[in-house]
Amino acid sequence: MLRREEQEAREFKLLSAHATKAAESKGRARPEDADLYRTSFQRDRDRIVHSKAFRRLKHKTQVFIAPFGDHYRTRLTHTLEVAQVARTVARALALNEDLVEACALGHDLGHTPFGHLGERVLTEYLGRPFVHSEQSLRVVDVLEKDGEGLNLTWEVRDGIAHHSWSRPEPSTPEGGVVRYCDRIAYLCHDVDDALRAGIIDLYELPSFSRKRLGIGYSERIATFVNDLISTSAEAGEVRLSEEVARAMDELREFMFERVYLSDEVLASQRQAQHVVESLLEYFTKHPDEITGQHRVMSDPVEIQVADYVSGMTDRYAIELYKRLFVPKGFV
């Protein structure tokens, strides 16, 4: 039998001096009794996995809205891939795998329906940037468990809040691992999905990134992961080598030009934009129809509406739009 205290002691023996130890966590906003068998970061991981927001990720778009194939990524499969890649890196660097896993599993809980399109529409609606990493933190702090939140540790909250490259760097090396692995995962699997959709051809990929990262999906992932591990171990900080970082930037620029802003993706986004805008307008006029945990009564109406609509899955948003705006005989 392996109790929590023994696991915490093992962390001090086995993990790197740079690793974040569960026993040294800065704690939770609301203090809790320790668990018999799970460390604080393990409990956070479990709370995230059992949350409603986590389950909804399976019906939220990654890039392709309502694809016909069964093998395109969703926000949930993306999250799981980030967690797997990040744990591999953390294990090799002797960092805290439990902290990495919790941050990875929670990093996209605040994502809107229809991918980043929903984020842009909510930015226009609110008149200020709607940032999914900030909303992810709001989900775990406020919206889950009917307003109680998940009461996660400071370290997991920090990793969730700072996983995006537009935000300040995370305070822990584990958060830094998730930050890199999020980008690694989405670039590699978005290329894979774009090839499957026929939007790009394999040999259209930029020549330097193709040469440096490899041609196949597995080869690209392996190159990124191995480079992140070896470079970070040598540098004493989480980062890629200059050459692989250049290949990543080149591939990301290509994906924006040829995939994320392609006619095929933008065409479906225009339809989705109308759905989100219509729902925002409707619930602004009818806030009493907002249901469940998505409503904090003390907040302004526009915040209540943003919480509600941003928490919807693609499928639920479309069905709700039909119910509200499409005559029954036309459905």
Positions of PLM-derived features:
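Histidine-centered, transition-metal-coordinating active-site segments
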Residues: 1-79, 83-89, 95-97, 130-331
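A generic, well-ordered mixed alpha/beta core segment in the N-terminal half of proteins
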Residues: 99, 103, 108-146
